[in-house]
Amino acid sequence: MWLLYLLVPALFCRAGGSIPIPQKLFGEVTSPLFPKPYPNSFETTTVITVPTGYRVKLVFQHFDLEPSEGCFYDYVKISADKKNLGRFCGQLGSPLGNPPGKKEFMSQGNKMLLTFHTDFSNEENGTIMFYKGFLAYYQAVDLDECASQSESGEKDLQPQCQHLCHNYVGGYFCSCRPGYELQEDRHSCQPECSSELYTEASGYISSLEYPRSYPPDLRCNYSIRVERGLTLHLKFLEPFEIDDHQQVHCPYDQLQIYANGKNIGEFCGKQRPPDFDTSSNAVDLLFFTDESGDSRGWKLRYTTEIIKCPQPKTLDEFTVIQNLQPQYQFRDYFIATCKLGYQLIEGNQVLHSFTAVCQDDGTWHRAMPRCKIKDCGQPRNLPNGAFRYTTTMGVNTYKARIQYYCHEPYYKMQTRAGSKESEQGLYTCTAQGIWKNEQKGEKIPRCLPVCGKPVNPVEQRQRIIGGQKAKMGNFPWQVFTNIHGRGGGALLGDRWILTAAHTLYPKEHEAQSNASLDVFLGHTNVEELMKLANHPIRRVSIHPDYRQDESHNFEGDIALLELENSVTLGPNLLPICLPDNETFYDLGLMGYVSGFGVMEEKIAHDLRFVRLPVANRKDCETWLRGKNRLDVFSQNMFCAGHPSLKQDACQGDSGGVFAVRDPNTDRWIATGIVSWGIGCSKGYGFYTKVLNYVDWIKKEMEEED
């Protein structure tokens, strides 16, 4: 209840009749002239009214009236709801009268009547007495219309809610139990259960009036809708009773249950349905009744459980499910990986990772992948080499092994210090799907040309005047050039030509462009060489000390030609080695000079060679002075041959090398380059000392390596 206490101005009463008070929530009522004595021979009735939905509460703050037996002379009479609430007079503590004291007077309705009556005089034992009268406060108090009917007998005070009554300050409203609908009169209820919706995670549902008889002619639809990912469980309680027939199944009344739109049962009779795990978050219960019957109906409790997904199962023995759980439910997930050396495959697509999530319908959002062994693919081809499988031929999957090797004896695998060639060339297909070597990683090895090891080396133990025709494979490094006439050179590695600078830039001639450089390799016959085609030149490098304009100075007479493409080495095409010490220039050491130059004043068609000793430097200097020549003979040159040998390099042999066999390694070394001389077979020949230019040669070759 809500009580409102406030004061308002005093109300003065007049003799005779009734005085209505304007409808307010609170106020006061006084006797005339209060607190002065009230007049004689006075009667009036004050009507106190509060808004509908409230009751009137009245309390006297001050009360001083003439006392009398039975309050016959002066009195205040209070009535409400057609009932007399009392007749009062006197004062608190007087021997006569009936003062109200602090008693609270309460109406059942929104009206209260207060009648004030005085007689013709106020005397006591011949003495005139003065009485102040009364002061009373009233207030509106909320009326609980939903409480039981008062004893006043006023039927309009009792709400006629058929089902449920709800009180509020100043009024009330009616509502109906689930399955019923409030009618237009706002008091009565009629069955209406065609669209009952339940969304809580658990609860109870029953037929109307359960466990009393349900109403006739029902068409009820109870829908349970919970969050996706939950599954509903139904458990029917006792008693279960729906009209039935002994011979026909549920002809009168029936309860139908649907889950996911599918009918999972139709029930009647007295046998309680079994418990249902619907595997659905949506269930509908349809209850139909005919016009008769007195069965008690049904009631169920529904609960929810998070939906579960089936236990994930791998498709092969190589798939691994991380942290496998005993069960998986909605929103759980699992991660699948592969054992070492295998990779995830979904359809035809390679996956880097795999995660599957349990969906709200109890299925995984993607199918289990399979694990396929890693395939490293076909091993890369090794230039100037090949590979062989040390495991199953043609199988390139995880743990497969191959051995790279070079085409010997023409190439040899580059190895690190302290490592073996077999270790350098052994590659394994790793778990990452990459061919890998323990030392070199993914990088494949290199096959380096083997220098100075001809398959068919020259054998010459005697001097032959005018030289000798070379056989195939005697001088496989020999190069035939045709620039400013015939010239020679030697193969270094598989794409460099060592030659004399003056074959490219002859003394007192103009420079020649790369386009006119003709280079041939791989045969001892000129005509056959021409058939093998020219090797294009990518770059020409002339030593900076070479001076084309100084005709008697062949200082720095050395050059390098870089081929556009590497050549493939073989028995007739092999490089020569570079010197690494001065012993290759010891006096009398025999060397070989080969070329396609002039022989007996005729152009040679075949490769020929001569065998010459390294000459004494002083003898060569003396011989030059005897010829009255001003030619420069520097420390970067050496001489070979002897005036008595009648053998020498000649025109067309320039650029070829002076080749010496190293007895310690059995390798052939290019110690010199045919540079200059005086005539052919008429004395000493002069050669560029290659040892003094090895650093320059290596630097030039490394720039493009």
Swiss-Prot record:
Protein name: Complement C1r subcomponent
Keyword Ribosomal protein: no
Record GO cellular component, one term: blood microparticle
Keywords, alphabetical: Autocatalytic cleavage, Calcium, Complement pathway, Disulfide bond, EGF-like domain, Glycoprotein, Hydrolase, Hydroxylation, Immunity, Innate immunity, Metal-binding, Phosphoprotein, Protease, Repeat, Secreted, Serine protease, Signal, Sushi
Active-site annotation: H502 (charge relay system), D557 (charge relay system), S654 (charge relay system)
Complex formation: Core component of the complement C1 complex, a calcium-dependent complex composed of 1 molecule of the C1Q subcomplex, 2 molecules of C1R and 2 molecules of C1S. The C1Q subcomplex is composed 18 subunits: 3 chains of C1QA, C1QB, and C1QC trimerize to form 6 collagen-like triple helices connected to six globular ligand-recognition modules. Within the C1 complex, C1R is a dimer of identical chains, each of which is activated by cleavage into two chains, heavy and light, connected by disulfide bonds.
Sequence ranges assigned to domain Sushi in this UniProt record: 307-373, 374-449
Keyword check for Calcium: yes
Species assigned in the record: Macaca fascicularis
